[in-house]
Amino acid sequence: MKRQFRHLDVPYRSQWGDPALNREIRNGCMDPCDDPAWRNTGFRDETAYRFWSRRVCGIACLESILDFLGIAHENRKRMLGEAIDHGVYEIDGEDSVKGLIYRPFCRWIRSRYRLNARIYEGAPLASVTQEISPTCMIMASVSPEIATPQQPNHRRGGHLVLIHGADAGHIWFHNPSGIPPFQCDANLAIDHAERFHAGRGMLIDFGEGANVPPRPNQPLTGPA
């Protein structure tokens, strides 16, 4: 029997500043540094922000999980610095980065935030989303083209989204670079989403041994 579960009220985090500006920035109509909220990320250098804001989808997904659980964390620039120090990103020259690299990411969030993570490979969404539970969400590798799923896609993978709910036929997810209606709490048929999916990602477990603080008076879950 297909497991059905959906987390409610998971905070959304854009990989830029103001989520309302995702469309303009994504489409190249707006300089990311013209968004007044960009300094809230901790960056002060415009060139560095422009470079990294295109590459921090995984950090944005992690922020959503931490904020949902009430786990304190640094600003995005400092989190990125820690991730680089732990080998999550490998900088190659002035304009190339390898990452987010899964294994060091899993080690980092375990040591830093006491979150357990398991890498999955070669698994379709219909299978892996059955792992979503009161103590588990999924960071899945998809094409950034999932922002406009009504359009044909030309690749799989290269971008991370946070899947926080699933039923027999659909997923619910946050896309850090998404545009409405496929941005926050986006709902998409699993079969449709699969064409963007690279078949890999990470299961983020905040259950036993994860040292998660209590969240009084806040519903953790809801029906799918």
What does each model-found stretch correspond to?
Residues 1-95:
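Active-site-adjacent structural segments surrounding the nucleophilic cysteine of cysteine proteases
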Residues 4, 66-223:
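Conserved active-site-adjacent core of cysteine acyl-enzyme catalytic domains
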